[in-house]
Design a protein with these regions (language model features):
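Extracytoplasmic/secreted envelope proteins and their assembly/folding machinery
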Residues: 35, 49, 80, 94, ...
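Exported/periplasmic cell-wall-interacting domains
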Residues: 75, 231-329
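Short peripheral tails and domain-boundary helices/loops at the edges of structured domains
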Residues: 60, 66, 165-173, 317-329
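Gly/Pro-biased beta-strand-loop elements
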Residues: 153-265
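Short beta-strands and strand-coil junctions in structured, solvent-facing domains, enriched
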Residues: 89-90, 144-146, 185, 208, ...
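Sec/Tat-exported extracytoplasmic proteins
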Residues: 56, 87, 138, 163, ...
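A short, structured loop/turn motif at beta-sheet edges
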Residues: 42, 129-132, 218, 252-253, ...
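Acidic, low-complexity Ser/Thr/Gly/Pro-rich repeat segments typical of extracellular/periplasmic
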Residues: 1-163
Length: 329
């Protein structure tokens, strides 16, 4: 087999000579020529001479995998294969995806709408074991995502799960507790050690003098999705503020961060006064920030509003495992 430039296409013949298998991907919208000699059932030689053309996509779609190659992430990090829009042929996409872990980890895929597009997320049943090696292989080249839309190429990622660290954030305690060596969800007793306990101030929306669900720190398993040493916090009306804050760990795209706030140090440890973020002192915020990894879980409890899909991008852990398995995938 040759392409339009006359270059031979790599391939191999089966042992019995009955089948020839491609050894490389064919290009889109290309013409190939096949020549050769076959032996018929009567033992006579039969010449082969013909050509064919490959599909011409209307659009070649690039997918991306997170975490990226070489990253070290926390024990609540999901694998996300990002698409600009949800493919119509989801079954074909799913068949092209494999996850290999060392050691073996139970998990499953589900289609989730993310800010800026769609993704198919692979979440483990429980938190990842520390030190797990993960290989993701998305053989998407040649896969038709939707009519006329084909995968632009294969993508892979090899990443590692780092040390096990969980932040336990009980809004009624006015503190956060950072533990390591944790092996189970929602179980501080499964952790090997307590790294630090810091006074904190949470969202004031549950207070009797300022009832407002928009100002409640959401309860549930959050995931650290961004680490910013400096960030401008801007409130939306009627909550107008514009301030530069330091040591910011984003835990939800609804605007929740763990960050320093020197203006609430007197309230930290005794009163919840924030707009929904978890406020720490400058010293404690810096210490926590430097210990954090993307993908670390932050388990918030003690508030009246639960984290949900309405709160943004990474909400995979809001689903019990039985519900996750029943999501479209």
């Amino acid at each position: 087999m040759t392409n339009t430039d006359g270059k031979v296409v790599q391939g191999s013949l089966s042992g019995d000579g009955s089948r020839w298998t491609l050894g490389e991907d064919l290009g889109y919208d290309k013409t190939y020529t096949v020549t050769g000699i076959a032996t018929g059932a009567d033992g006579r030689s039969v010449p082969i001479d013909g050509n064919f053309s490959t599909v011409s996509p209307d659009d070649e779609v690039n997918a991306m995998i997170a975490p990226a190659d070489g990253e070290v992430v926390g024990i609540a990090e999901s694998i996300i294969v990002h698409f600009p829009s949800k493919p119509e042929n989801t079954d074909a996409v799913e068949k092209a995806l494999t996850v290999t872990t060392t050691p073996h980890v139970e998990g499953a895929w589900a289609w989730i709408h993310h800010d800026g597009g769609w993704g198919i997320d692979w979440r483990p049943k429980n938190y990842w074991p520390a030190g797990t090696k993960v290989h993701v292989d998305a053989k998407l080249y040649g896969v038709e995502f939707s009519p006329g839309e084909f995968g632009a190429g294969d993508v892979t990622s090899d990443f590692t799960i780092g040390r096990s660290q969980v932040v336990y954030a009980d809004a009624n305690s006015y503190q956060i507790v950072i533990k390591q060596g944790c092996t189970a969800m929602k179980d501080p007793g499964s952790c090997r050690s307590t790294v630090a306990t810091y006074d904190a101030s949470y969202g004031k929306g549950d207070r009797s003098d300022s009832k407002d669900p928009n100002l409640v720190t959401r309860s549930g398993i959050h995931v650290v999705s961004e680490l910013l040493s400096q960030h401008i916090m801007v409130g939306s009306p009627p909550y107008t503020y514009h301030s530069v804050e330091y040591w910011d760990a984003r835990i939800s795209v609804n605007g929740e961060f763990i960050h320093e706030n020197p203006n609430t140090v007197g309230d930290q440890g005794n009163t919840n006064v924030s707009h929904g973020c978890i406020n720490l002192s400058p010293k404690n915020a810096e210490s926590y920030f430097k210990s954090a990894l993307l993908g670390d879980p932050v388990e918030v409890t003690g508030t009246s509003v639960q984290l949900s899909a309405a709160d943004g991008d990474v909400f995979d852990w809001t689903f019990p495992w039985s519900e996750w398995l029943n999501l479209p995938a």
